[in-house]
A protein has these predicted regions:
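Short beta-strand->loop
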Residues: 115-122, 180-185, 202, 213-248
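Bacterial N-terminal signal peptides
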Residues: 4-15
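N-terminal (or domain-start) structured segment
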Residues: 20-116, 154, 162, 178-203, ...
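Beta->alpha turn/N-cap motifs
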Residues: 91-96, 159, 188-189, 206-211, ...
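Short hydrophobic/charged patches on amphipathic alpha-helices used for structural packing
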Residues: 76, 142-145, 193, 212
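An extracytoplasmic/periplasmic, membrane-proximal ligand-sensing/linker region
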Residues: 28-30, 175-179, 263-326
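A ligand-binding cleft/hinge motif common to bilobed small-molecule-binding domains
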Residues: 95-107, 167, 171-176, 203-235
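Hinge/capping helix and adjacent helix->loop/strand transition within the periplasmic-binding protein
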Residues: 22, 54, 81-87, 100-191, ...
């Protein structure tokens, strides 16, 4: 009788156990970290040292998968619809919140929705900078605005894609200043920077990490930042707000997973990422790019992300419909 009850109990326990219970020993195979942009951009530059540190901590390979397209929507959708088992992660940028709002604006089905993801950790967060070629006559933001107003639509800015992390803050600036620039969208941060360095555009709005080497080499110049105060590494560069323009925008990168990833897997990834951001390669890589780490653990990150996404939804509505050329 007792033996029968024990067996019955085991059968019931097995029946109600979570589907992931048999695979508690995570990770047991390589992990893919998707970057929704080509190499050389903020997401890629953030992902690679983090992946290296995670490999050592988790004792499994962590492969970077660059899956570019549609300003990040292709890679974001890939992860949103992947099996939620912890083996497909995304190094997301701020644009992950923007693109579903753009789909709504244009009345089309979204490639993904933000609630298909859960945050593991925010890695960095930085204002964007208005960056121009050093061989232009613009030494200050006033120089740039005055010239742009004299010849609307002639100055070209490149971006990482329509409504991407480099496009949205430039639209905010154009609305706040009344200038009209011509837009050259590309497929990511790397191609965007190649465009300005190659003379195909004269300006970009980007986190300083993508521009720092070229600023130090004398090829590019910083005019203003989208924060509320000067950036520590460049105290001489004023904020748009301090110059009278209502432009405030934070470019961030964070590690996220499909929303139904088992809690025990998320915990392992949270703990590992918390340790990873303290590793030398992560600290050094951010220091070289003049980008401070701005780590947030999952709970804090998800709450912050919700508020940031709400703010960006309002920004998208204010920007309105923008076509591929302006």
């Amino acid at each position: 009788m007792l033996r029968g009850l024990v067996l019955t109990g085991l059968i019931v326990a097995t029946a109600v156990a979570p589907a992931w219970a048999a695979d508690d020993a995570y990770p047991t195979r390589p992990i893919s970290m998707v970057v929704a942009f080509p190499p050389g951009g903020v997401a890629d530059n953030t992902a690679r040292p983090v992946a290296t540190a995670l490999e050592r901590i988790l004792k499994q390979p962590v492969a970077i998968i660059n899956k570019a397209g549609a300003a990040g929507a292709v890679g974001n959708q890939t992860v949103a619809t992947s099996k939620p088992d912890g083996y497909t992660l995304l190094m997301a940028l701020v644009s992950i919140s923007v693109l579903p709002e753009v789909d709504k604006l244009f009345g089309r089905p979204p490639n993904y929705t933000r609630d298909q993801f859960t945050g593991i950790a925010r890695i960095n967060a930085d204002p964007s900078m208005l960056v121009v070629r050093a061989d232009t006559p613009w030494k200050t933001l006033k120089d740039f605005v005055d010239d742009a107003k004299k010849r609307p639509g002639e100055i070209v800015f490149s971006s990482s894609g329509l409504y991407g992390a480099a496009h949205v803050p430039m639209e905010m600036f154009m609305q706040a200043s009344g200038v009209k620039l011509r837009h050259l969208p590309t497929t990511g941060g790397g191609p965007m920077m190649n465009a300005i360095l190659g003379g195909h555009s004269q300006a970009v709005m980007t986190p300083v990490s993508l521009a720092v080497a070229h600023v130090k080499a004398g090829k590019l110049r910083l005019l203003a930042n989208t924060g509320t105060a000067p950036v520590a590494a460049y105290p001489e560069v004023p904020s748009f707000k301090s110059l009278g323009y209502d432009v405030e925008y934070t470019a961030w990168a964070g590690l996220v997973a499909p929303v139904k990833t088992p809690p025990h897997v998320i915990k392992i990834l949270r703990d590992a990422t918390r340790q990873a951001v303290k590793e030398p390669e992560v600290i050094t890589s951010h220091a070289k790019l003049d980008t401070p780490l701005a780590y947030m653990d999952a709970d804090e990150f998800n709450a912050w992300w919700e508020k940031d996404a709400q703010k960006l939804a309002a920004v998208v509505q204010k920007i309105g419909k923008v076509e591929s050329a302006q």
